[in-house]
Amino acid sequence: MKSHSLAIAGLLSQYLPENAITGVLANIAVETGGSFDYTQKQKNGPGYGLFQFDYQKPYYFKYLEKEGLNDSAESQVMFMADAVYNNKSDAEGNYTGALDLGGPARKAIQKSFNEGSTADVTKTFSEKYEKPSKPNMDERLKSAEDFDKFKGLFTNPLSLP
């Protein structure tokens, strides 16, 4: 089920600030080998989906069940956005979101999304959320540079001529 990068950018624009879209999209491009397929499986590994969920996979499927959602590109983006932006905890101070990245990681990603350059967003998201065994950072940064040429078009891709 291949999705075009513009469709994924449109989904990201519903949950992330404009500043973050190209950096996250670049990470997805590398994670999926350019397919942008939310069912993409890692070759010889456990990774799955747009973000190649590895350790996150059981948390993701629990999130789907709890929220009554089906697996989809949008559900994966929603799960990622929840992990980044959900700062809620219970009365004892235990984190209540679907995936606990840790407060410092969440804050670093949020700050990068709001204030960082495309390169900063790309690196921070890779290091604090994706946590790949092989970062391929040069490839991520090159992809971000390519997507950055279209920055500003991602907020409402359906309005393109």
Report each predicted region and the residues it spans:
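Short, functionally critical alpha-helical segments immediately adjacent to catalytic or ligand/cofactor-binding
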Residues: N19-S35, M80, K123-S126
